[in-house]
UniProtKB/Swiss-Prot annotation:
Domain of life of the native organism: Eukaryota
Originating species: Rattus norvegicus (Rat)
Key word Cell cycle present: yes
Compartments, record wording: Nucleus; Chromosome, Centromere; Chromosome, Centromere, Kinetochore; Nucleus matrix
Name of the protein described by the UniProt record: Centromere protein W
InterPro entries named among the record's database cross-references: CENP-W, CENP-W/WIP1, Histone-fold
Molecular function terms, GO-annotated: DNA binding; protein heterodimerization activity
GO biological process, one term: chromosome organization
Assigned keywords, A-Z: Cell cycle, Cell division, Centromere, Chromosome, DNA-binding, Kinetochore, Mitosis, Nucleus, Tumor suppressor
């Protein structure tokens, strides 16, 4: 069970609330934010990274590559961003 304790140390259990709020205030100072919007932003980011990983893995499998390369991730990012626009 040593593996599980080392993995738990690397994974953050909470969203970086202060960092997200500070970054949003720097970029958009007049934007009014609700109380827990930082959690929604963090969740959205995690979902994007998960979709990116899945899509890049399928791109790597289609090109018969055992390793996910930079090109696979860039192609996956284009597809995911195009889907998210609507």
């Amino acid at each position: 069970m040593v593996l599980s304790t080392t993995v738990c140390r690397r994974i953050r259990r909470k969203a970086p609330c202060a960092f997200l709020k500070r970054t949003l205030k720097q970029k958009k100072p007049r934007l009014s934010l609700e109380k827990r919007c930082d959690l929604l932003i963090h969740l959205n980011c995690l979902l994007f990274v998960q979709k990116l990983a899945e899509e890049s893995r399928t791109n790597a499998c289609e090109s018969k590559s055992g390793v996910i390369k930079k090109d696979h991730v860039q192609a996956a990012a284009k597809v995911i961003l195009k889907k998210s626009r609507g």
